[in-house]
From Swiss-Prot:
This is Profilin-3. Occurs in many kinds of cells as a complex with monomeric actin in a 1:1 ratio. SUPFAM superfamilies: Profilin (actin-binding protein). The keyword Cytoplasm applies. The variability of the residues taking part of IgE-binding epitopes might be responsible of the difference in cross-reactivity among olive pollen cultivars, and between distantly related pollen species, leading to a variable range of allergy reactions among atopic patients. Gene3D superfamilies: Dynein light chain 2a, cytoplasmic.
């Protein structure tokens, strides 16, 4: 399966039991910042933004004072899982980032999708990739 198929079929799909509810944007990005696959709506990001995200995975709390920046959007960092998941909130939407051995799985959402639904979609794919050694 191509990386784009993972984004299209496992991240940008309808959320179980909620037809028509789906993430706003999603991507799989290598630890080096190279985009493996992304939805058409995923924001163009700066290398320093990806560096900040990777630093927060290695040093949890790094982004808390400044917020998580991705493209033109600033998210307030909320409780995640140290070294494994970063979660951010902005208004009625937010972001979940799951770290795997080689990649970061991004999901961005707006209402009516809930934070928990975004977490489920992103973390399920991230856990699968971890199980595959990726």
């Amino acid at each position: 399966m191509s990386w784009q198929a993972y984004v299209d079929d496992h991240l940008m799909c309808d959320i179980e039991g909620h037809e028509g509810h789906r993430l706003t944007a999603a991507a799989i990005v290598g630890h080096d910042g190279s985009v493996w696959a992304q939805s058409a709506t995923f924001p163009q990001f700066k290398p320093e933004e990806m560096n900040g995200i990777m630093t927060d995975f290695n040093e949890p709390g790094h982004l808390a004072p400044t917020g998580l920046h991705l493209g033109e959007t600033k998210y307030m960092v909320i409780q995640g899982e140290a070294g494994a998941v970063i979660r951010g909130k902005k208004g009625s939407g937010g972001i979940t980032i799951k770290k795997t051995g080689q990649a970061l799985v991004f999901g961005i959402y707006e209402e009516p999708v809930t934070p928990g639904q975004c977490n489920m979609v992103v973390e399920r794919l991230g856990d699968y990739l971890l199980e595959q050694g990726l």
